[in-house]
């Protein structure tokens, strides 16, 4: 399989808002999409890493009609890895024993790490609601910004590791719930036509959205907030969407 990893984007620097990045990168990704559409085979797989990754991936999706929508994904594995690591520390358990962690929505501070369906060593995780909402969720959401605050730069090594994990899942499949940004089609009442992180089953032959997950009510509200953010981002770049 041929892969294109879209790492390059105007970087987010200290004090910069995500909204500042959107239009700066939209034109870049449209021009890259046009070249990709012209020269790449239809089964090429494209992973968008450069932020705002979901909306950059949306621009690629709209401007590469020769490539399957399912082959264009945005990186959410970094958030997935962070969420598992934070829960691992809390429970003093190995990361590999944590299953069914979900990340919903955008790769931004509105992302929704959801551990209400998590299992550790085949047992349902049962943690205090206050810790989940006051500590766990904000810690995952803000981790990228914290690293920029400390280093003045984003987390390159962690992102590289997450890209490797993302490709490994696409190539070899996974026995766990995966978090990948894909083009939404109305699942869980999410607006169609957004690049949205959804819970997936992934095999070496493809992926499918896991249906009928019971979403805790407070998580559902957060998912709607992330959806709203992605709709606003889509509106900002609508001139780049044919």
Name each region found by the language model.
Residues 10-11, 52, 107:
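Gly/Ser/Thr-rich beta-alpha loop segments that engage phosphate groups in nucleotides
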Residues 17-85:
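Rossmann-like NAD(P)(H) cofactor-binding subdomain of soluble oxidoreductases
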Residues 1-22:
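NAD(P)H-binding glycine-rich loop region in Rossmannoid oxidoreductase-like domains
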């Amino acid at each position: 399989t041929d892969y294109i990893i879209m790492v390059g984007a105007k970087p987010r620097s200290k004090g910069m808002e995500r909204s500042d990045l959107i239009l700066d990168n939209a034109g870049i990704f449209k021009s890259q999409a046009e070249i990709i559409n012209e020269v790449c085979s239809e089964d090429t797989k494209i992973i968008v890493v450069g932020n705002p990754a979901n909306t950059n991936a949306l621009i690629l999706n709209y401007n590469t009609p020769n490539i399957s929508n399912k082959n264009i994904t945005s990186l959410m594995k970094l958030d997935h890895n962070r969420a598992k690591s934070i829960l691992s520390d809390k429970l003093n358990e190995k990361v590999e024993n944590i299953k069914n962690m979900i990340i919903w929505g955008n790769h931004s501070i509105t992302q929704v790490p959801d551990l209400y369906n998590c299992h550790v060593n085949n047992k349902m995780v049962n943690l205090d609601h206050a810790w989940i909402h006051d500590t766990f969720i904000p810690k995952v959401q803000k981790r990228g910004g914290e690293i920029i605050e400390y280093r003045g730069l984003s987390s390159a090594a962690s992102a590289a590791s997450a890209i490797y994990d993302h490709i490994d899942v696409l190539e070899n499949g996974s026995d766990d719930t995966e978090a990948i940004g894909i083009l939404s089609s109305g699942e869980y009442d999410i607006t169609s036509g957004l690049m949205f992180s959804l819970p997936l089953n992934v095999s070496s032959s493809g992926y499918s959205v896991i249906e009928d997950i019971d979403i805790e009510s407070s998580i559902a509200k957060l998912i709607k907030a992330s959806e709203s953010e992605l709709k606003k981002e889509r509106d900002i770049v609508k001139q780049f969407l044919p």
